[in-house]
Amino acid sequence: MEEGKMDENEWGYHGEGNKSLVVAHAQRCVVLRFLKFPPNRKKTSEEIFQHLQNIVDFGKNVMKEFLGENYVHYGEVVQLPLEFVKQLCLKIQSERPESRCDKDLDTLSGYAMCLPNLTRLQTYRFAEHRPILCVEIKPKCGFIPFSSDVTHEMKHKVCRYCMHQHLKVATGKWKQISKYCPLDLYSGNKQRMHFALKSLLQEAQNNLKIFKNGELIYGCKDARSPVADWSELAHHLKPFFFPSNGLASGPHCTRAVIRELVHVITRVLLSGSDKGRAGTLSPGLGPQGPRVCEASPFSRSLRCQGKNTPERSGLPKGCLLYKTLQVQMLDLLDIEGLYPLYNRVERYLEEFPEERKTLQIDGPYDEAFYQKLLDLSTEDDGTVAFALTKVQQYRVAMTAKDCSIMIALSPCLQDASSDQRPVVPSSRSRFAFSVSVLDLDLKPYESIPHQYKLDGKIVNYYSKTVRAKDNAVMSTRFKESEDCTLVLHKV
């Protein structure tokens, strides 16, 4: 960052989550990420700097090692002129969603993270004058718990995402249950992956967004019908996938465009050869537990037809989905097995609070921290060291379960044969693409009790709902058989 030349008019609002806000530069492929805090919570500049530096270090020393340097962009901490930050804050305020304005942008420290703009291709520093499409997917957890510590039988049959959908709809978070099941996407089977991606497109919730030239064109819009959304989306995408033919508008055109998009995303997700160290986890973390979620609509529809769900074809080991799944599976014990170990660490810290720094709970996230994560033993020797390792592995696994994958696509130019970037074909065109991961902040140690309570809540609600539905079905069948009258006619 060239501090003396910062102009707030060159930056625009890009988006925000619960803990940070992002602005993007108009010409350069960079974004600034600022922390957000409730109005009454004051942090010193040093604390904010350390918080941001920890995020950078964790990305650089841990997630880059697991996922590969081509996928992980950890950025750097920068110090900005306070006047620039204040003016920027005023400029973007009107663009912020009302639901996010309960927290304020940090305008006092001057610190932010500078990162590449992942809605652009990750090969050029400046925005190219060609159209760019970016699909952001939050794939969620791709396996069913295999730990013997799991006490709820349902957790061995139905994935966390599918169970959580029922609770989210009941509490009004979403209007309807999504047909998406992460196990279908992570299966490596193209038929199941296509179904998963179409389901995400039908009910995006906050798990799918599409950007065109850096601008959000498709995401969670509760008030609008999926049909209207799809036709509008197809209008945006048609020039990418059918650049020169006169494909008419209407349902046929919409279906053709969506099909092309789904096929291209699938090919990109199955591609890749970036070297990460996640392979070091695979001997202990092979595919365990069921490979199919009983609640997946894809699996249910096949069962109704008397067919078996296609097994996972297996993800290529170089692809990002495979590596992400490996890191997710560092959750070796499930939250049920992990929570007693968290309590062991807590008791130790109550007795020796000064040890918190030595245990690296709040960092530093360095090579030593990373090396301890590679211990995949599940034999509890009763020590604090064992408990701490499992707690840290769980935090890293939860981070991988909540990360987002960014796929940037740009139509290849006629003279692009010398281009060094990877290319994916569609029916009528070819795309240069890049794949990146974001949302890689380490999950807080303090959130573990909340995760334990939430897990129980999700499973109990799902079990109750499913039991009620099953009882209703059985009751209807019994009633039908009761009401049935056999009439014999003389012949």
From Swiss-Prot:
GO terms for molecular function: ATP binding; inositol-1,3,4,5,6-pentakisphosphate 2-kinase activity; molecular adaptor activity. It catalyses: 1D-myo-inositol 1,3,4,5,6-pentakisphosphate + ATP = 1D-myo-inositol hexakisphosphate + ADP + H(+). Its EC number is 2.7.1.158. It holds the Pfam family Ins_P5_2-kin. Gene3D superfamilies: Inositol-pentakisphosphate 2-kinase, N-lobe (3.30.200.110). GO terms for biological process: inositol phosphate biosynthetic process; inositol phosphate metabolic process; positive regulation of transcription of nucleolar large rRNA by RNA polymerase I. Disulfide bonds: none annotated. Phosphorylates Ins(1,3,4,5,6)P5 at position 2 to form Ins(1,2,3,4,5,6)P6 (InsP6 or phytate). InsP6 is involved in many processes such as mRNA export, non-homologous end-joining, endocytosis, ion channel regulation. It also protects cells from TNF-alpha-induced apoptosis. Belongs to the IPK1 type 2 family. PANTHER family: INOSITOL POLYPHOSPHATE KINASE 1 (PTHR14456), INOSITOL-PENTAKISPHOSPHATE 2-KINASE (PTHR14456:SF2). This is Inositol-pentakisphosphate 2-kinase. It comes from Homo sapiens (Human). The lineage of its organism: Eukaryota, Metazoa, Chordata, Craniata, Vertebrata. The gene is IPPK.
